[in-house]
């Protein structure tokens, strides 16, 4: 069917005679949704409440309200949704997983190119991580115009090609350029994931599914040092990057075969349907042809580009992002610099072998894997932060003391493990809060969250010189104190005044 012949289907999810559009009501009432069916009768009236679609057990109102169309991802089967969540979680691992490979190769690269580990750390790991954050801003602009799937697919293909370039790079400059480009273009799944979860799952299940998705990119920076540290100890650093390229290729293949477009334009009246069906629709959607045809119904370029700037200044978003950015970012900082603490000979470091460093990086992986009403207010999500912050402080202080005073390996493991548990708890709470507060801007929320955590991770640039001069306990203790101060400043304020700010 030609573009001009694009068919449209009227939504049956909202009555024409009603003043309330149930398909977009969750966006209009951002941050405050009626979950209990009985409460809905009081809040919305009997007439509107009788039209609300409920969960299978009849105990919860579904937000967003599903349409009657089989194209609506809210109506997909549980297995179909689970497959898409699995795919986006696998893809979300790629950016930080690839950047983390540099941790395993830092000493071999320094030896091969006759430079210091600090230079290699800054030139490769730090810059590639930094560019992951900025790439997300461009991704969300493209997604608003062309959909989730084509941006996800092409970003992963390009990322795989740049990883291959890093694997085969003949010199350090080429290697660093390939690493940075792979980070910049590969960040799409870390933005798309929040979209996919909210596209497919109703409000009351979103935090649970966000746990699964965030697990992917929280654990990913530690997976590659843990897995490939043993490999680099036996072969060369190129094998580690080659294995990372293979993983990216597997993700691309899975996206090619099984990933689906979850973007559904439920806010348009009537809701536009895809111009093709079957295999042709599959191929055109993957390549971006369908997105080009559907773009005329979606945001203009001006609106897509300006959208991030319309929300970033909001105090309820900016404050919580600074808090989470420092908390998550300092976690990135210790991930990048711990290899130096562990691998440097005494008295500054522990003098671990490549095998010992690789085994130690299994700690945060295990830690994250182990720790997985009527009217709902978004600020309720933030109560989890009261659990996360004390754990974070304990973890950082124990880890700093272990490094400075050369305590047992158990102290290192316990400190790092507790800190990563805290980051997992806090990240899910903050993402869920931001998603609830800005239901029309899930991509922007993901992009700014990604940028905030990366900017917070810039501590790696000065963490090692600081620790050399004043000790690791002071460094990690100050970082924990900064997070605690931001928590006291931001979280109670949002819980008291968040509804008014919204």
Task: Identify the residue ranges that each predicted region occupies.
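Helix-loop-helix hairpin linking two adjacent transmembrane segments in secondary transporters
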Residues: 216-266
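C-terminal transmembrane bundle
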Residues: 96, 126-129, 133, 140, ...
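Intrinsically disordered, low-complexity terminal tails of fungal membrane proteins
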Residues: 1-80, 259-304, 371-378, 501-502
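Conserved MFS/SLC helix-loop-helix module at the cytosolic interface between two early adjacent transmembrane helices
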Residues: 134-173
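Extracytoplasmic
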Residues: 80-117, 189, 334-340
């Amino acid at each position: 069917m030609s573009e001009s012949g694009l068919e449209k289907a009227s939504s049956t999810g909202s009555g024409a005679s009603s003043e309330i559009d149930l398909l977009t009501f969750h966006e209009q009432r951002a941050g405050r949704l009626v979950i209990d069916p009985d409460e809905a009768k009081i809040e919305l009236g009997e007439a509107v409440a009788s039209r609300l679609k409920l969960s299978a057990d009849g105990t919860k109102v579904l937000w967003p309200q599903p349409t009657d169309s089989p194209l609506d991802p809210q109506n997909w089967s549980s297995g179909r949704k689970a497959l898409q969540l699995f795919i986006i979680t696998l893809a979300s691992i790629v950016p930080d997983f690839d950047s983390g490979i540099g941790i395993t190769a830092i000493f071999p690269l320094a030896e091969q190119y006759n430079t210091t580990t600090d230079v290699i750390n800054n030139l490769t790991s730090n810059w590639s991580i930094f560019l992951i954050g900025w790439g997300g801003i461009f991704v969300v602009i493209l997604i608003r115009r062309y959909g989730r799937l084509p941006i996800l697919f092409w970003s992963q293909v390009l990322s795989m090609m740049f990883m291959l370039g890093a694997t085969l790079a003949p010199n350090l400059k080429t290697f660093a350029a390939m690493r940075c480009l792979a980070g910049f273009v590969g960040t799409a799944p870390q933005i798309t994931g929040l979209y996919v979860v909210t596209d497919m799952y109703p409000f009351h299940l979103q935090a649970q599914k966000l746990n699964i998705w965030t697990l992917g990119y929280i654990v990913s920076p530690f997976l590659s040092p843990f897995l490939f540290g043993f490999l680099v100890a036996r072969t060369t650093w190129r094998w580690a990057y080659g294995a990372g390229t293979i993983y990216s290729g597997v993700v691309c293949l899975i996206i090619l075969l099984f990933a689906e477009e979850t973007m559904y334009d439920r806010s348009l009246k009537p809701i536009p349907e895809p111009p093709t069906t079957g295999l042709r629709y599959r191929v055109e959607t993957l390549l971006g042809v369908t997105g080009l045809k559907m773009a005329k119904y979606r945001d203009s370029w001006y609106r897509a580009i300006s959208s991030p700037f319309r929300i970033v200044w909001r105090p309820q978003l900016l404050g919580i992002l600074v808090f989470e950015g420092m908390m998550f970012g300092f976690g990135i900082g210790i991930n990048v610099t711990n290899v130096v603490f562990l691998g440097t000979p005494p008295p500054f470091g522990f003098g671990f072998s490549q095998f010992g460093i690789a085994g130690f990086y299994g700690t945060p992986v295990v830690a994250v894997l182990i720790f997985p009403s009527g009217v709902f207010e978004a600020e309720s999500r933030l109560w989890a932060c009261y659990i996360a912050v004390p754990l974070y402080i304990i973890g950082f202080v124990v880890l700093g003391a272990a490094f400075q005073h050369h305590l047992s390996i158990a102290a290192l493991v316990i400190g790092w493990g507790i800190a990563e548990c805290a980051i997992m708890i806090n990240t899910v709470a903050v993402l869920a809060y931001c998603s609830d507060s800005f239901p029309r801007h899930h991509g922007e929320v993901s992009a700014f969250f990604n940028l905030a955590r990366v900017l917070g991770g810039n501590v790696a640039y000065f963490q090692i010189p600081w620790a050399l001069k004043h000790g690791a306990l002071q460094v990690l203790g100050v970082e924990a104190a900064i997070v605690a101060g931001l928590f006291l400043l931001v979280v109670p304020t949002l819980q008291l005044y968040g509804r008014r700010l919204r």
